[in-house]
């Protein structure tokens, strides 16, 4: 919690924003909204932070929370006391530097069947005959660094 000053209001707003944006989680945003938005304020669905989080997650093709390969760092870059009305009301503004890294790698099984013909020097895809029936496709899965296999040059 920050002091009962206009600057304290700016700092509190920055802390609220950072706590929601760093988590990029709809459930976390709901908890913060419940704790820090007064009754009669914007509803959870109308709250700009909820809209920002859901837009990020939708754009990143993630679920209700960012996945473990996604990193979000938030740093306050500026603050402004835009207005005050007595000691208890402040129009506070914050500028945040938000950096996100999304690291996702996918591995796919792919099958290729070709007639191969020895040319006297090497095997090449044969020119004659119909293409053989292809194998069934396989499903996609995430690739981890330990699952990468070396490949030889063609």
Residue ranges and their predicted role:
Residues 1-60:
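Core segments of small alpha/beta cavity-forming domains
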Residues 78-81, 111-117:
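Hydrophobic/aromatic beta-strand elements that line small-molecule binding cavities or substrate pockets
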Residues 103, 125-154:
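Low-complexity, intrinsically disordered terminal/linker segments enriched in charged
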Residues 12, 91-93, 124:
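Soluble periplasmic/extracytoplasmic beta-strand elements of cell-envelope proteins
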Residues 98-109:
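Short, cysteine-centered beta-strand-loop-beta hairpins and adjacent loop/turn segments enriched
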Residues 71-73, 108-111:
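Short coil-to-beta-strand transition motifs
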Residues 59-100:
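Surface-exposed, charged secondary-structure patches
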């Amino acid at each position: 919690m920050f002091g009962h000053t206009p600057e304290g209001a700016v700092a509190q707003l920055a802390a609220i924003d950072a706590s929601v944006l760093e988590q990029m989680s709809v459930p976390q945003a709901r908890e913060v909204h419940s704790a820090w938005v007064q009754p009669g304020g914007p509803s959870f669905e109308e709250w700009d932070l909820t809209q920002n989080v859901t837009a990020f997650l939708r754009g990143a093709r993630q679920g209700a929370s960012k996945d473990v390969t996604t990193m979000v760092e938030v740093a306050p870059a500026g603050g402004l006391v835009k207005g005050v009305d007595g000691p208890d009301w402040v129009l506070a503004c914050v500028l945040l530097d938000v950096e996100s890294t999304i690291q996702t790698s996918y591995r796919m099984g792919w099958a290729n069947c070709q007639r191969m013909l020895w040319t006297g020097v090497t095997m090449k895809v044969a020119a004659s005959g119909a293409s053989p029936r292809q194998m069934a496709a396989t499903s996609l899965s995430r690739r981890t660094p330990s699952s990468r296999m070396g490949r030889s040059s063609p």
